[in-house]
Amino acid sequence: MSEIVSVSGGPTKPEIIAVSLSKLGLQDGDRFADVGCGTGSVSIEAARIARNLTIYAIDARKEALLATEANFKSFGIENARVLAGEASELLGSGGSIDSIDCAFVGGTKNIDAILEKLVEKKTRSIVVNAVRIETVVRTIEAMKKLGIFDEVVHISVSRSAPIAGETMFKPENPVYIVVGKKQA
């Protein structure tokens, strides 16, 4: 199995990806945006869940784009475009993305503008991962204003570690998963 090429901040943890993608509700043939794609690890898992997924991996950081491209190649991810720039601009009316069915947002810079653009594109479901409380509050407020707020899930993961010949658990940083759904 291939190893993920990492960047600062590392890839999203597998447990967080699993819950995030479950909340996203990907379907075969969806157009999927991975905003703040980092290593592309979320897109790689999304491609395993939904067949014929069209992926738009977006990040403003050069190191993230290079890591994502390397990881996509290593994991055989096709039907993916790696896009450099600010998500709010790339998702805007002048951008190169026509429509999005589902979006994962791991990069929360300009979260209000990103959410607005995704709603304009009639995105069915949006999942935002955040570790900072202020980001969670801004995201919830923006989603409520846009009429798409569904729920927040707080996840704390602990991993086993050896201690004195026995086992203890070491906690990882908790993550908030904020879910937005298009209202019928």
From Swiss-Prot:
Q: Which domain of life is it from?
A: Archaea
Q: Which reaction does it catalyse?
A: Co-precorrin-6B + S-adenosyl-L-methionine = Co-precorrin-7 + S-adenosyl-L-homocysteine + CO2
Q: In which pathway does it act?
A: Cofactor biosynthesis; adenosylcobalamin biosynthesis; cob(II)yrinate a,c-diamide from sirohydrochlorin (anaerobic route): step 8/10
Enzyme class at the top of the EC tree = transferase
Gene3D superfamilies noted in UniProt = Vaccinia Virus protein VP39 (3.40.50.150)
Offer an example of a GO molecular function term for this protein. Answer: cobalt-precorrin-6B C5-methyltransferase activity
Single GO biological process annotation from the record: methylation
Name the residues that bind S-adenosyl-L-methionine. T12, G36, C37, G38, T39, G40, D59, A87
Reported EC number(s) for this entry are 2.1.1.196
- Entry keyword set: Cobalamin biosynthesis, Methyltransferase, S-adenosyl-L-methionine, Transferase
Return the HAMAP family for the record: CbiT
Q: State the similarity comment.
A: Belongs to the methyltransferase superfamily. Archaeal-type CbiT family.
Q: What is this protein called?
A: Probable cobalt-precorrin-6B C(15)-methyltransferase (decarboxylating)
Species this chain originates from: Methanosarcina acetivorans (strain ATCC 35395 / DSM 2834 / JCM 12185 / C2A)
